[in-house]
Amino acid sequence: MDASQSPLPQLPSLSDLESRMQVMRVSALDDNQTGETFSQRAEWFYQRSPLLLSLCQDLYDGYATLLDRFNQNPKQVIPHDNDTDTDITSEVESILSFQQMEVSTCDMQKNIEDLVSQLVTANLEKDTAKHILQRREQTLQEACKTIGLLKKLVMLLDMEKEVAVEETANLGHKLTSLLEENRELASEALFMKNEAVKLARCVLKMRDEHFHKMCHLQNQIYELQSSREPVYENESSQSCFGLENSKKKSKKRKMSETRSETGEKMRSKWFKRLNTINPFTKCSITPLSSPLYHAAL
């Protein structure tokens, strides 16, 4: 038998076992009161799991010690041979039960380690998923804020667009009114131009008429002067002094010179007045170029 052949392990004291059991009870009460969190489960995995394993190991050592003592005591205490069969059967049953308990404790230890590792991995995955979910929620909130700002910007742009459309319509109305005014002014300018042309024609016609009248008056004056010359000649022939004839001739010359000078002055005054009457066209008729003037001379 392996348990009897191997040296007995050193068992812990009863007070040590009680203290460790008390720690396990307190930790169990704390878990029931506060609930399970990731930090508590990690603390349990790294601190309380070794304590539980050590308690299981102590329990196994205690069972091994009790089995060894039980195997030694029946040979010394019990003197009857009739009970040997029952002792052997009970010993075999205890050995089998102890082996089953040993196997079950090992399996339980492995199962506990597997469960703890699964819990830790599940909690890590849960925390990772929660962190990813929080980041996605933050991204979603930022996207919602951005969408709200974009909506406000679109509303402002629509308002500016409406204002620009109204301003464009007002400018279009102003442009049409200015075009109409321009057309009216153009028509008025054309009318004024036609009226100016008519006025210029009238002025030219009046100037020609005045010039013809003036030439006719000059001709009449010249005829009157020429009709008076024979009378002066007859009077000069009756006189007997040659000095008087010379004086008369000089007087005639002076009169003719003054007559020509006064005629020229009058003609120049008339032409100046006619030139100042028409502001649009200049006079193309001058005293020297007029055929009537030459005829009058």
Swiss-Prot record:
Coiled coil: 107-130, 175-195
Biased composition (Basic and acidic residues): 255-265
GO CC terms: cytoplasm; membrane
Main location: cytoplasm
Record key words, sorted: Coiled coil, Cytoplasm
Key word Ribosomal protein present: no
PROSITE patterns in the record: NAB
Boundaries of every NAB domain copy: 1-77
Location(s) in or outside the cell: Cytoplasm
Single GO molecular function: actin binding
Claim: tRNA processing is one of the keywords in the record: no
Region (Disordered): 235-265
Function of the molecule: May be involved in the receptor-like kinase-mediated signal transduction pathway.
Protein name per Swiss-Prot or TrEMBL: Kinase-interacting family protein
